């Protein structure tokens, strides 16, 4: 795989609280320069990203219910609508992990369905936070996502105790079939990214995108 091909797997990411306007501007410039698929940013920066990415092919991805996923469903749906109105091209929502742990699967499904409906055709990725789930819970969550028809299931927020693993990516891909799988959290070098893709990942979320496509390792990145 060429570096240009690998770049098209990457959502170039900056989600930590301290990121300022210059950081987001730099992120957008890097995404254009290296041909990344998208930038993944908090929704408050969508207008800035829209301005910086004008005329390019780089998409704007934003997060909903991030990073805990424990918001009211109505708030997630409203957040989704507002983000799309502002210019988001893709939505990454966080599943309600607490409801999964409470075995409230109907509520989990309703939560995702409400955001999916709010997307109104905009691609939706559902973050499972796999490091907090059992294998059975991962499978069940993936089955719900597949039934609803979301675009992707995604491993992690990058804000918890663990990120993507090859094992979890493979399990997710095996469960969802033709739906996309996004590996995020801890993917910081070419070798790891390629291992995730081999396991079934069709998108990589990383703040270390430049290191990934250039064959170096980014020891500073946390996502």
Curated annotation (Swiss-Prot):
Its EC number is 4.1.2.4. The keyword Cytoplasm applies. Catalyzes a reversible aldol reaction between acetaldehyde and D-glyceraldehyde 3-phosphate to generate 2-deoxy-D-ribose 5-phosphate. The active site is at 92 (proton donor/acceptor), 154 (schiff-base intermediate with acetaldehyde), 182 (proton donor/acceptor). It is found in: Cytoplasm. Its main location: cytoplasm. SMART domains: DeoC. It is an enzyme of class 4 (lyase). InterPro entries: Aldolase_TIM, DeoC, DeoC/FbaB/LacD_aldolase, DeoC_typeI. It catalyses: 2-deoxy-D-ribose 5-phosphate = D-glyceraldehyde 3-phosphate + acetaldehyde. GO terms for biological process: 2-deoxyribose 1-phosphate catabolic process; carbohydrate catabolic process; deoxyribonucleotide catabolic process. Pathway: Carbohydrate degradation; 2-deoxy-D-ribose 1-phosphate degradation; D-glyceraldehyde 3-phosphate and acetaldehyde from 2-deoxy-alpha-D-ribose 1-phosphate: step 2/2. Keywords: Cytoplasm, Lyase, Schiff base. GO terms for cellular component: cytoplasm. Belongs to the DeoC/FbaB aldolase family. DeoC type 1 subfamily. The keyword Cytoplasm applies. One of its GO terms (molecular function) is deoxyribose-phosphate aldolase activity. NCBIfam families: deoC (TIGR00126). This is Deoxyribose-phosphate aldolase.
């Amino acid at each position: 795989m060429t570096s240009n091909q690998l770049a098209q797997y990457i959502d170039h990411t900056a989600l930590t609280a301290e990121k300022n306007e210059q950081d987001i501007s730099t992120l957008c410039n890097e995404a254009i320069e290296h041909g990344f698929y998208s930038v993944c940013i908090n929704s408050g920066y969508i207008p800035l990203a829209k301005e910086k990415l004008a005329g390019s092919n780089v998409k704007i991805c934003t997060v909903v219910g991030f990073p805990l996923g424990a918001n009211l469903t109505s708030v997630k749906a409203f957040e989704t609508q507002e983000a799309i109105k502002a210019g988001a091209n893709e939505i990454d929502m966080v599943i309600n992990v607490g409801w999964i742990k409470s075995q409230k699967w109907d509520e989990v499904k309703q939560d995702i369905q409400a955001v999916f409906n709010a997307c109104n055709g905009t691609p939706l990725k559902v973050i499972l936070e796999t490091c907090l789930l059992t294998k059975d819970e991962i499978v069940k969550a993936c089955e719900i996502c597949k039934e609803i028809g979301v675009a992707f299931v995604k491993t992690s927020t990058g804000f918890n105790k663990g990120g993507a693993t090859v094992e979890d990516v493979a399990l997710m891909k095996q469960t969802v079939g033709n739906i996309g799988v996004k590996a995020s959290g801890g993917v910081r070098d070419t070798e790891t990214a390629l291992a995730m893709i081999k396991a079934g990942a069709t998108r990589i979320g990383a703040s270390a995108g430049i290191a990934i496509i250039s064959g170096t390792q980014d020891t500073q990145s946390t996502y």
